[in-house]
Amino acid sequence: MIVQIGRREEFDKKLLGEMHKLRAQVFKERKGWDVSVIDEMEIDGYDALSPYYMLIQEDTPEAQVFGCWRILDTTGPYMLKNTFPELLHGKEAPCSPHIWELSRFAINSGQKGSLGFSDCTLEAMRALARYSLQNDIQTLVTVTTVGVEKMMIRAGLDVSRFGPHLKIGIERAVALRIELNAKTQIALYGGVLVEQRLAVS
């Protein structure tokens, strides 16, 4: 697999189109979420804010996109703050250049690992943690399902809730903080911290 992280304008239209079609397949067709799909692509207003994306591609000549993540700076609009503020349960929405929000995670991989995540998902999480720490990001926030929360906890990540889960659409949704501290890094990388890897790379 090939993992790339960059701003929207750094990716060509072909890759962005594949990403938006993948999101439509995963969120609308597979999960049945109430999302808007235009020309077989799932796009929302946050995609107009020059977000960062992680694109996961097959390591083949076609290099088809089969996974993606959207990454937004919390100093501007983002989903937890502006779309799902009820999941904050009255707490102040994070606003810091050192905190990013993850959203629109989609992957086409049926392989499951021992902790519930596919090997591809775990590799994507490692790449995201490495990139975040390289850019002085200390905390990630996300709106996800209770099922994914359980897998994160089982994997050993340092995860905490803003408050109880709520039923949103067909999902039991929860807002989480993920600290990119030693606990999370050891869970993702074993005994060697990301900072140590960066220092010798």
Curated annotation (Swiss-Prot):
Annotated Gene3D superfamilies: 3.40.630.30
Enzyme type, top EC level: transferase
Keyword Acyltransferase on entry: no
Recorded superkingdom: Bacteria
Keywords recorded for this protein, A-Z: Autoinducer synthesis, Quorum sensing, S-adenosyl-L-methionine, Transferase
InterPro entries the UniProt entry points to: Acyl_CoA_acyltransferase (IPR016181), Autoind_synth_CS (IPR018311), Autoind_synthase (IPR001690)
GO molecular function: N-acyl homoserine lactone synthase activity
Catalytic activity: a fatty acyl-[ACP] + S-adenosyl-L-methionine = an N-acyl-L-homoserine lactone + S-methyl-5'-thioadenosine + holo-[ACP] + H(+)
Protein's GO biological process: quorum sensing; signal transduction
Record-listed E.C. numbers: 2.3.1.184
One Pfam family in the UniProt entry: Autoind_synth
Cited function: Required for the synthesis of PAI consisting of 3-oxo-N-(tetrahydro-2-oxo-3-furanyl)-dodecanamide also known as N-(3-oxododecanoyl)homoserine lactone, an autoinducer molecule which binds to LasR and thus acts in elastase biosynthesis regulation.
Family named by the database record: Belongs to the autoinducer synthase family.
PANTHER family reported in the protein's UniProt record: ACYL-HOMOSERINE-LACTONE SYNTHASE (PTHR39322), ISOVALERYL-HOMOSERINE LACTONE SYNTHASE (PTHR39322:SF1)
Name by which UniProt lists this protein: Acyl-homoserine-lactone synthase
Species the sequence originates in: Pseudomonas aeruginosa (strain ATCC 15692 / DSM 22644 / CIP 104116 / JCM 14847 / LMG 12228 / 1C / PRS 101 / PAO1)
